[in-house]
Amino acid sequence: MKYRYLIIGGKEIINPKEIDKVLISNGFYWLVDAEFEEAEIEIENNTVIWKGGIWLYGTWNYGIWQNGEFRSGKWLNGIFEGGEFLNGTWESGIFKDGNLNDNVKVNVINKK
């Protein structure tokens, strides 16, 4: 299952087709195009907040990552607050906490 839920405007949505529709209408095409499982997502102030799940592949454009596994893909920008960054390319962003695997290709990282 791709999504567990999406919370937007205080409303929880669990229907995958409805979630895709909401993400597209809010300009988050990159999230719809990515491959992941069991995603727990919230949108607040036009920002994606990834609460949990497994990111399999795709390009993370921006947002706040709170928990879960980033298994492969490209991280363009955002704040990584916790979880596991296992593989892929880190272009830019802030790494606050969690595990950054040694085989991740890192271009620019700010640790806070």
Q: What feature does the model see in each segment?
A:
Residues 6-112:
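Extended beta-solenoid/beta-helix repeat architectures
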